[in-house]
Amino acid sequence: MKVIVVGMGVQGVKRKKYLGNDFVCSVDKYKKADYSSIVDVPLKSYNSVLLCVPDNEKIDIIQYCIKNKKNLLVEKPLFIKSNKILINLEKKAKKNKVILYTAYNH
């Protein structure tokens, strides 16, 4: 598995620490990271994403990952104003055979 960590706050730093050789790079537009945007990371370099960003940034990144067939572990909460959006994301993930999982781990 080749994993990128998006969001280098407390959870992103913790998750990076445990990835070992599976870690590819970090992405964060506010903090020191390898890239400031996920779109700059070469798609062939990874197959999974650990998403540890604020809620207002999650949907766009999730959609990008699903479109590009990248598996996702989303740090909770995954708060969205409309269940329709969640249902649509789930359908797209299934269609693209992408694992989309929300978790809470400390």
Model regions and ranges:
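Beta-strand-loop-alpha-helix segment that lines the small-molecule cofactor/substrate pocket
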Residues: 48, 59-104
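Local beta-strand N-terminus motif with an aromatic residue
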Residues: 23, 46-49
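Short acidic low-complexity segments
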Residues: 33-46
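N-terminal Rossmann-like dinucleotide-binding module
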Residues: 1-33
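Alpha-helix boundary recognition
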Residues: 17-20, 42, 94
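Residues at the C-termini of beta-strands that transition into short coil/loop
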Residues: 27-30, 39, 104
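Substrate-binding/gating loop at the entrance of the active-site cleft, primarily
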Residues: 54-55
